[in-house]
Each structure stands twice: as C-alpha cells, then as structure tokens.
C-alpha cells in the first residue's frame, strides 16, 4: 500500500512539473544615456517566422502595441522634446498606428495596459508625432527598437523590422 501511495505521489509531482520553454517573443530591456537624460525601453521582440508582417499581421491604420505580449514601455529621467512637444519626465506606453508611408507614434500616459488599452482614450496621449517610413535594405527577423544618432542634444528612436 505504501508503494502505491508513493507511486501516486510521484505521478502527481511529475505531472504538475512545468517545462519552461523560451518565449516566442523574448523581452528586451535596455537603458541609454542621451546627454544627461536616462532613457529606458522595455518591449517584446516578435519574429517574422516566414509571415508577412506589415499590412497583414499588423494591419495598416490600426493601433499597435509596438511589440508583442505586453505594451512597450519607455521612461525618461528628464523632460524631453518629442517633435515640438515637451514630454514630462516619467514612464509611458509606446503605441503606433502604421501606414504604408508614415507611422503615428503615441506616448500614452497609462502604462499598465497589458497590450492595447480598452477603451483607447485620446486624452491619455501625452505626445504624438508622425514619422516617415523607410525601407530597410535587409529585413530583420526580430522587431527591434534602438536609440541611434546619439549626441548631447538628442537622439532618434528607431523601430525596425
């Protein structure tokens, strides 16, 4: 009888064990100093995996969480200029509305959205700007956010896929 109980316990313990596997869209988290301002970006990096992304998986004209899984986050240690608007120091969600020739980029005040906020609230947009798209010579397998052209007065945030 003890042996039988032991087998049941052993079976229960092994059936409850979870096999941990890598995320399909791994999290990226980095900090960059630009001038005297610390910028931190956290996002998930979806992969193409043979899929058509723009205009298909991510439809044109729809708001996108700008990554996968949870919404992408950006924080600034100091006030920054986004386009022609001052964005206060703090943490924001990054959302985008892709189109073929340009993207609308939104810095959204609510950061605990776990994806797209429901409902979308225009009054929570802290800043937005429209940027032109450029074709890359080599597509990237993984969606990438980077901070480039860094100098003491500013930098560019690049979204590439």
Where are these regions (language model features)?
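Bacterial Sec-dependent N-terminal signal peptides
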Residues: 1-20
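Residue-level detector of alpha-helical segments with a strong bias toward transmembrane helices
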Residues: 12-15, 46, 94
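Generic detector of short, well-ordered, non-transmembrane alpha-helical segments enriched
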Residues: 13-14, 88, 153
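Flexible, active-site-adjacent loop/turn segments at secondary-structure boundaries
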Residues: 14, 52, 62, 78-80
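Primarily secretory-pathway and cell-envelope proteins
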Residues: 18-59, 111-161
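Aromatic- and Gly/Pro-rich amphipathic surface segment
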Residues: 55-71
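Mid-length scaffold segments of soluble, non-membrane domains
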Residues: 66-114
């Amino acid at each position: 009888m003890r042996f039988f109980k032991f087998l049941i316990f052993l079976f229960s313990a092994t059936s409850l064990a979870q096999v941990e596997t890598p995320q399909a869209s791994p999290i990226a988290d980095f900090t960059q100093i630009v001038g005297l301002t610390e910028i931190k970006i956290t996002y998930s990096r979806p992969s193409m995996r043979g899929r058509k992304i723009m205009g298909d998986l991510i439809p044109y004209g729809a708001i996108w969480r700008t990554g996968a899984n949870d919404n992408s986050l950006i924080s600034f240690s100091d006030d920054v200029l986004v386009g022609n608007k001052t964005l206060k120091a703090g943490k924001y969600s990054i959302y985008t509305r892709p189109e073929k020739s340009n993207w609308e980029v939104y810095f959204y005040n609510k950061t605990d959205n776990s994806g797209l906020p429901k409902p979308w609230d225009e009054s929570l947009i802290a800043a937005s700007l429209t940027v032109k798209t450029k074709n890359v010579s080599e597509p990237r397998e993984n969606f990438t956010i980077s901070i480039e052209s860094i100098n003491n007065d500013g930098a560019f945030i690049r979204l590439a896929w």
